[in-house]
Amino acid sequence: MTDLMTSCALPLTGDAGTVASMRRGACPSLAEPMQTGDGLLVRVRPTDDSLTLPKVIALATAAERFGNGIIEITARGNLQLRGLSAASVPRLAQAIGDAEIAIAEGLAIEVPPLAGIDPDEIADPRPIATELREALDVRQVPLKLAPKLSVVIDSGGRFGLGAVVADIRLQAVSTVAGVAWVLSLGGTSTKASSVGTLAGNAVVPALITILEKLASLGTTMRGRDLDPSEIRALCRCETSSERPAAPRSAAIPGIHALGNADTVLGLGLAFAQVEAAALASYLHQVQALGANAIRLAPGHAFFVLGLCPETAAVAQSLAASHGFRIAEQDPRNAIATCAGSKGCASAWMETKGMAERLVETAPELLDGSLTVHLSGCAKGCARPKPSELTLVGAPSGYGLVVNGAANGLPSAYTDENGMGSALARLGRLVRQNKDAGESAQSCLTRLGAARVSAAFEQG
């Protein structure tokens, strides 16, 4: 979802005809794929709110034909295709263009996954997003902005974007005069710096003003670097007592009734990945049930549209057989993983296999009250923020960080031979010490980091 839109973006090539390498800090794209441990990786951000099933099937077919057949949905709800080569990226771009999938480039402009159809949203944010894209498109000289700069236009609803970090955030609020938009800078909705309130017709001019300010300061500047009081004056924001509603955290996996007999099915990818053939097979099956489109969603998830309550239940059962996360209670929802050693040259852990081992040996940890982060290295790409339990791969084995991020100092260690028993001991620690009605998170907090570390390392 960005300001620049094309049917497909042909990769740039260097003098030797190879795909251009990424500039530091940039997101991988068709024009600038990223080298990984399993070949080149491309991130695809469709401009359409909904992708028809034939388009997704065509994309899956192309991913298998021109890559290694692994498709990912990122934490922010973008598609990634893996295992490409310098020769196959242009052919992938052509296949995407032939499927008439419009790809977004440049500034990320994000709206909630069910924007326009969520009965609980305060306003439809898509017209503002479209107006902003168009305003940026017509500029004779494009703005030079930080590569990962993002604008979130959050209308609330069941699946709002309050937990998504943004450089510039707009949150809809209901006022006596109608809908207004609260402007803030940096962070999630609870940590962002508030600027002020804007009327609907003032939103896009204000956003352009902020983007111009960022561009004038250089391509490394982010929303957090701006002075809220200066932006308040520049954008002529009003101060108001209106505050956005607290962000909702409805789980995406599951069947969701939207009213008027409309039903959507939320599904998650197991450990952020799916095989292209499995995805295409599933979409063919649900197409026969009446499904007509999907919407990508944060949290490595997507929604299936066009179902009724009866067919949604069938589609959910089919999804389970294909390995998707189908319900809020799925233990895999509580695990965050990066690509791991199979997909990243920096990783020292095969994270997907480790995640499966964790589900099998320590299900007591995965009640949904905490997150277990499996990181191939100390960079912590899958989850930069702290987790209750973080397992980090290293040349000598694995480290455990309790209540910290992957770059934190581990408090316990084990090697490959001891990992299975270490995970089992953590599960047993919770099982044997958890009080009735107590969550795994509360239990581990009560026991303390020292005891958790000792169980992992020594038993």
From Swiss-Prot:
Q: Does the keyword Oxidoreductase apply?
A: yes
Q: Determine if Glycoprotein is one of this entry's keywords.
A: no
- Top EC class of this enzyme: oxidoreductase
- The residues that hold siroheme are C381
Instruction: State any single GO MF term.
Output: metal ion binding
Q: What are its E.C. numbers? A: 1.14.13.83
- For this entry, the protein name equals Precorrin-3B synthase
Species the sequence originates in? Sinorhizobium sp
